[in-house]
C-alpha cells in the first residue's frame, strides 16, 4: 500500500513482536494529515481487488470502523481449505448469519480500518500479552462483556490484575456506540 508504514524485524535482532504494542506505536506516530488508519495481518490476501476504495467509501459514508472482509477462508500448509468463518462485523450486523466457525461470534480480527478521529478515542489499545488481542479489541469495539467460554477459560488462569486490565478496555469505549461496517469479499488466511 503506497505510503504505508512498514515495521521490519529480524530474528537476529528481535525475539518478540507484540502486535498491539506496534499498533499503538504506529498510531502514536501517524501524520496529522491522515484521515484513516488500517491494520492488516500480513498473511491475509483479499479477493476483493477494490477493498481499499470500498473501505474508504464506507468510512466516508458514516462508519467509524470497517472490518476489511466479510468472510475468512483458512488454508492449511498445502493451500487446502481447512475451515471458514464469517467476519465479526458481518455477524454483529446480522445475528442470523449461518456459518460454522471455531468462534461463535465470527472472526474478530484480520484487518480493520477506521477514521483517525474515532480511533483517537480508542487508542491506545491494550497490550495483550496473553494472546487473542483481536478478540479483546472486538469486545471493546462492540462494548460487550459477553466473553466467550474459551476466552473466559483463558482469562481465568491469570491474576485478577491481568483480568481487570483486560476487562476495563470494553468499558473504556463501550459508550461510544461505534458504527461498524464490513467490506465485501473474502480474505484467505495463509
Q: Can you annotate each of these PLM segments?
A:
Residues 7-9, 67, 181-182, 189:
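Structural signal for conserved beta-strand scaffold positions within catalytic alpha/beta enzyme cores
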Residues 36, 64-65, 180:
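Short, Asp-centered acidic motifs that coordinate Mg2+ and/or phosphate
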Residues 40, 108-110, 184:
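Residues that flank catalytic or metal-binding motifs in active/ligand-binding sites
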Residues 47-143, 158, 163:
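Conserved catalytic core of nucleotide-sugar-dependent glycosyltransferases
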Amino acid at each position: 500500500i503506497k505510503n504505508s508504514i512498514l515495521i521490519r524485524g529480524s530474528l537476529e535482532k528481535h525475539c518478540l513482536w507484540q502486535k498491539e504494542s506496534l499498533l499503538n506505536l504506529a498510531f502514536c506516530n501517524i501524520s496529522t494529515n491522515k484521515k484513516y488508519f488500517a491494520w492488516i495481518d500480513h498473511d491475509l490476501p483479499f479477493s476483493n481487488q477494490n477493498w481499499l476504495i470500498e473501505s474508504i467509501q464506507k468510512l466516508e459514508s458514516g462508519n467509524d470502523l470497517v472490518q476489511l472482509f466479510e468472510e475468512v477462508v483458512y488454508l492449511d500448509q498445502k493451500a487446502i481449505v481447512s475451515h471458514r468463518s464469517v467476519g465479526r462485523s458481518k455477524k454483529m450486523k446480522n445475528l442470523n448469519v449461518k456459518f460454522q466457525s471455531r468462534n461463535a461470534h465470527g472472526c474478530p480480527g484480520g484487518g480493520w480500518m477506521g477514521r483517525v478521529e474515532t480511533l483517537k478515542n480508542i487508542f491506545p489499545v491494550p497490550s495483550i500479552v496473553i494472546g487473542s488481542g483481536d478478540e479483546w479489541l472486538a469486545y471493546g469495539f462492540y462494548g460487550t462483556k459477553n466473553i466467550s467460554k474459551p476466552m473466559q477459560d483463558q482469562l481465568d488462569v491469570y491474576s485478577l490484575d491481568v483480568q481487570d486490565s483486560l476487562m476495563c478496555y470494553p468499558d473504556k469505549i463501550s459508550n461510544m456506540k461505534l458504527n461498524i461496517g464490513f467490506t465485501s469479499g473474502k480474505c484467505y488466511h495463509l
